């Protein structure tokens, strides 16, 4: 899939380039803002709790989630140097989604890693990534479970999640 491969190539160029870790992180954040549906992933991650948000909470959550997502995503990826990802196949799931299958090529220090990209294709002019499934584990679903756990362990208090996200981002 051209969209995923070009996104991967941009990230690989950044990671393999002669940049400081901070520069890498900034460049990865730019790529994520352009190619990932951060807002959609954030709303999905809240699950049914999003229905109980007032406008202020929703706005605060979306802002906090974007900071959290970008920091988490870019700092994890910045650890890789010269990652080589090959797109293997793609399969249209339905009218709105295509699953793109790829592998992170093995090196001496790590085995092959299977990465599937769930791409939202409803608007062909504006493709966005909605989930990464790494070795069968959905990052969006994992995020949703973590957030539900935080909210549930705080008696359903969404503000506890907001505090947690803001603490992580600072």
Model-derived features with residue positions:
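Early exported N-terminus immediately downstream of N-terminal targeting peptides
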Residues: 1-73, 77
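Juxtamembrane/interface motifs at transmembrane-helix termini
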Residues: 43-47, 79-84, 149-151
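Surface-exposed, charged secondary-structure patches
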Residues: 71-113, 164, 168-170
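Solvent-exposed loop/turn segments at secondary-structure junctions
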Residues: 50, 67-68, 106-107, 134-139
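Short, charged helix-to-loop "capping" segments that act as catalytic/coupling loops
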Residues: 106-110, 121-123, 153-156
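Short beta-strand edge/turn micro-motifs at domain boundaries
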Residues: 112-141
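Short loop or secondary-structure boundary microenvironments that flank
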Residues: 18, 91, 133-136
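Low-complexity, intrinsically disordered terminal/linker segments enriched in charged
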Residues: 131-170
């Amino acid at each position: 899939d051209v969209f995923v491969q070009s996104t991967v190539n941009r990230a690989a160029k950044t990671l393999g380039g002669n940049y400081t870790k901070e520069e890498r992180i900034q460049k990865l954040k730019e790529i994520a803002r352009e190619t990932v549906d951060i807002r959609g992933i954030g709303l999905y991650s809240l699950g049914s709790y999003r229905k109980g948000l007032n406008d202020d909470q929703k706005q605060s959550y979306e802002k906090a989630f974007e900071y959290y997502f970008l920091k988490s995503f870019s700092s994890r990826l910045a650890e890789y140097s010269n990652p080589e990802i090959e797109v293997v196949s793609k399969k249209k799931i339905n009218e709105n989604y295509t699953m793109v299958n790829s592998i992170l090529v093995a090196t001496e220090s790590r085995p092959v890693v299977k990465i599937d990209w769930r791409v939202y294709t409803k608007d062909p002019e504006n493709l966005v990534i909605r989930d990464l499934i790494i070795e069968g584990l959905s990052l969006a679903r994992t995020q949703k479970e973590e957030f539900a756990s935080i909210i549930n362990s705080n008696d359903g208090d969404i503000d506890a999640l907001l505090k947690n996200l803001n603490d992580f981002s600072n």
